[in-house]
């Protein structure tokens, strides 16, 4: 098989394997070539090549071994080669249909199937596709096809007509926002997908296409700033795009509480009930704030039953699992778990970089890869802080009339954050955090035990100390019970390799970074 035959098929396979954002950002722009009989994948610079080798080389090699096993492994280098079109579906060798449980990056789907609904209220099979059907299809076919269709030729229009059309669109958007409280910026097109939100995004799109069916309610939980509001509002915007006549409302739980109390105070309770029962989709953010308010919880219990019985979609967000909401009515905690409950996790490095690049593109600013990597490594905890950091750097770029964000500009704009992170973190803090995380004693981390359950956390702690402090290798060794600097170096290298090969350890490392820095 020649390179010209292989690469279009490889693109198709990678397109089917990877989330759309990853494929579009890293794989689709690649060019390839042949040098001295060796197949070469060209990246635009060394940073891109390093990212390709660490994140995608294994997948590319797996496809090569299957389709062109006689060829040697690919080489990755900066340069420019030939750009090939992706093979059509019928031209590619169809991969085996993956299980919903396959792959370490996907959450176990048995947690979200229909049998979670209580036995006393079984779900009747629908004649049309349910959200469960759509979600299953999406999980089999992730990543999704690009949502924006290619532009087609059209007749030119006058400036006046174009302005009138734009004004009408803006007025319609403003009117829709007033009626629904949805932000037009929160759509699936503006959402960046990664490991932390991939299943939730697929489920949200399925619900937008078939609301009120299997996954009702859709309960999304996670720490602040992870993108819960964006994702749930995207469902509302997508539903209105498909069904402009749908009645949709987004609100914070505080607004619901105030609305209910006003109805009680003004004796307009019946009007209040009818107002909420009219919606086809009701989205309530931070539902945990109704806890401890007995009358509000009682009223919401009846509203919940109405939505469930009428197969109208209810979407709720929270900071914890339903069962962990202290002070919440037990009946509500039980019902919150009837449908689909998913967690949003902090964005991984690749997703953070993609978010920064998308923000830069939207702002009309160019950001160098090294600068994006620097900011993404500096801000790890949540999307909101990451976007805030970018806004600061972007403002500096505009004020200094520098159209390209490089690493020096990023360092200057974020110097107070850099100083704060390095000021408070010590080796002792890291050792304490790692010991608590792995449930071992600090004396074990500092001691001589070499069993796997002790040695691995010790190496993780050494690696974190190297990354989060300014200590030299000998100083790190001193902090870990007087170990030699070569032992520290070996531990750091071992962890770096394991983070590429072991998804569980990589996730542990990311969680520890966030815990220690926050």
Curated annotation (Swiss-Prot):
Location of the protein in the cell: Cytoplasm
Which residues constitute the signal peptide according to the record? none
Q: Residues annotated as region Domain I, interacts with DnaA modulators?
A: 1-72
- Residues covered by region (Domain III, AAA+ region): 181-397
PROSITE patterns associated with the record: DNAA
Function, as annotated: Plays an essential role in the initiation and regulation of chromosomal replication. ATP-DnaA binds to the origin of replication (oriC) to initiate formation of the DNA replication initiation complex once per cell cycle. Binds the DnaA box (a 9 base pair repeat at the origin) and separates the double-stranded (ds)DNA. Forms a right-handed helical filament on oriC DNA; dsDNA binds to the exterior of the filament while single-stranded (ss)DNA is stabiized in the filament's interior.
- Name under which the protein is recorded: Chromosomal replication initiator protein DnaA
- Supply the source organism's classification: Bacteria, Pseudomonadati, Pseudomonadota, Betaproteobacteria, Neisseriales
